[in-house]
A protein has these predicted regions:
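A short, Trp-centered hydrophobic/proline-enriched beta-strand micro-motif
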Residues: 13-25
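Extracellular/luminal recognition modules and glycoprotein regions
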Residues: 35-38
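Short, flexible beta-strand-to-coil junctions
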Residues: 22-28, 76-81
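C-terminal low-complexity, charged extensions that often adopt amphipathic alpha-helices
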Residues: 89, 101-123
């Protein structure tokens, strides 16, 4: 389902989201889109599990540009365990989980994935 920047920002602040978006910088040999598990929910990210399992760390500084003017969002990428900028020109919300639901889903479906499985997930 296509989602606007403001709606996605609201979802990210409250949930963990699975999204697919158009890459800002195309890469040779990989699809034009990128799939991501991401979250901006600071309660989840700053929790013990967020810091130990997801390796969350605060950014320390804000972006050097106005993300709204660029139609982008900066979010925590759960697989890459780092902050990422996503292009909101074409974003699909595939799934979302509340913080309470997320850890069960993560432990059952995502934690067992190998590095190759995670790359396959991100490129589909």
């Amino acid at each position: 389902m296509k989602i606007s920047r403001s709606s996605l920002l609201n979802e990210l602040n409250n949930n963990v989201c699975e999204i697919r978006f158009l890459r800002r910088t195309p890469k040779d040999g990989v699809p034009a889109t990128r799939r991501m598990l991401c979250c901006n929910n600071l309660n989840l990210l700053n929790s013990v599990n967020g810091k130990t399992v997801l390796n969350f760390r605060s950014s320390g500084s804000g972006p050097r540009y106005n993300t709204a003017n660029e139609n982008t969002i900066i979010t925590w990428d759960i697989f890459m365990q780092n902050w990422r900028t996503i292009n909101c020109d074409s974003v699909d919300l595939i799934n979302k989980w509340s913080p309470d639901q997320f850890w069960d889903i993560f432990n059952e479906s995502f934690a067992p994935l190998s590095a190759d499985d995670k790359l396959l997930f991100m490129n589909t």
